Amino acid sequence: MEKNQWLAWAVELQALAQAGLYYGKDVYDMERFQRIRDMAAEMLSQIGELPLEKVKPLFCGEDGYQTPKLDSRAAIFREDKILLVQEKDGLWTLPGGWVDAGLTVAENTVKEAREEAGLAVRPERVIALQDKDSDNPPAQAHKICKVFLLCSELGGSFQPNS
């Protein structure tokens, strides 16, 4: 069996258990949902060959109904070229990142373009939504939804991110 399938099952079990813990009312069901959540963390620990005490706080640290993490990206064009920035891992991507609490997707995209490329931008419209797990294996421990916004360049001068 492929590791990615086991990871997908562990993530789904964790999300289902977390929903059960959030909505459950019966003490016995709560115990069962907690055990399922613990088992999902144990599965992830085995899959990733990581100590359980490191996995559990990251994988089981959220309360409430599990929802995807939101990532925003700025698509900035100059003539027929698109701006890419280099990540720490050496790969290239559109400027962007996790949407910070308290910011809208548009506000976050403006912030990320400034931080990662030194550019002031104005988001014009959403041009794509992406389920990262569906389009970019391997699967992550959390579902990720990427929002791509077409942006107009307002000013600034390109600064490579560090």
Where are these regions (language model features)?
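Secondary-structure edge/capping motif, primarily at the C-terminal ends of alpha-helices
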Residues: 17-24
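Long alpha-helical scaffolds
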Residues: 10, 17, 33, 37-40, ...
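Acidic, metal-coordinating catalytic segment for phosphate/diphosphate chemistry
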Residues: 27-73
